[in-house]
From Swiss-Prot:
The lineage of its organism: Eukaryota, Viridiplantae, Streptophyta, Embryophyta, Tracheophyta. This is CBL-interacting protein kinase 32. GO terms for molecular function: ATP binding; protein serine kinase activity; protein serine/threonine kinase activity. Its EC number is 2.7.11.1. Disulfide bonds: none annotated. The active site is at D136 (proton acceptor). Pfam families: NAF (PF03822), Pkinase (PF00069). SMART domains: S_TKc. The gene is CIPK32.
Amino acid sequence: MSTTKVKRRVGKYELGRTIGEGTFAKVKFARDTETGDPVAIKILDKEKVLKHKMVEQIKREISTMKLIKHPNVVRIYEVMGSKTKIYIVLEYVTGGELFDTIVNHGRMREDEARRYFQQLINAVDYCHSRGVYHRDLKPENLLLDSYGNLKVSDFGLSALSQQIKDDGLLHTTCGTPNYVAPEVLEDQGYDGAMADLWSCGVILFVLLAGYLPFEDSNLMTLYKKISNAEFTFPPWTSFPAKRLLTRILDPNPMTRVTIPEILEDEWFKKGYKRPEFDEKYDTTLDDVYAVFNDSEEHHVTEKKEEPEALNAFELISMSAGLNLGNLFDSEQEFKRETRFTSKCPPKEIVRKIEEAAKPLGFDVQKKNYKLRLEKVKAGRKGNLNVATEILQVAPSLHMVEVRKAKGDTLEFHKFYKNLSRTLKDVVWKSDDLQNQLS
């Protein structure tokens, strides 16, 4: 197994590992070679975007989002294009998903949940006021920065999964219905602002309760519960919080509470401070126009550099501060990705992962020392895909990265726990990693 890895550059950015995948895009960790700063780069396939007939809407929304500098919204720094790809350079957020906190510590205290909800409503309201709707608010789009502040990702990019029909309303097919408004599930066309608000209500419920308001193993029963807003508050929910949630989770979008009304709600207003930030637009949109006009003179340079040795310290650096800790440390915080080290030969690691995944209902696809685990039977929360990669960091030491490629965050955590029980004999305690290499 090689100890080298070919580096790929796009413009001034050096691309690293894949940190997220979707139907239309892949997200990679990258480094600005001029400043050394970490960024995330969302890579879109131009042909798919053109086929989807959403170019104008995506162009408009990306242009708007590039101008937005709200503290609770993930920034778009730059847009680049090549002959076949669109590269969107984004702020890199290091604190994991908001719902990791729920998985690790259970429901939040009311004042803590309120603070995150205030930040969420601020972000949503700001983007709505500029004509951009999210339409796909769910746990993996709610991130935390290193200071514990909420950052909403993928605003302005959700048009990739939408279709506008002759009635002028948005239509979508949803794979994860738990956070989705009744009018979206009915596919009769919907108002993006009111649909976003419903999702915010579901998110607030989870923060306060520690579980979803609408949950059922039968998909049709789940749809019925959502359509009728059939849910029960846990006994510890305060009356003011119940009152607000009941107004948000109103199945009729015409009578559902609006954001201006939420901003005046007594429960919401407690301890509320509107964020202060610089709204001056010193940003150019020339790069966006060049990409979507497909101007060849503005195509970014894509190139692969000579392979160089990859050691554990470079891997730690590439991970931008993410913990290299043992996968099975019971105190370790859950993330959408994790790593462990092993002294086993790579072929044995692959075999053990296969043996662990198949009884859990996963189909395993192998390519060299990369594995893709895909749930054979999609659950009510859609398909769960898990990507793993084995990297050699010393002659007898390997690092294994396990990450969620697609699917529900909470489902990934369940998979992770089951996998950990089977792979314990493969994992080597990483506390000695530095001694091994020194």
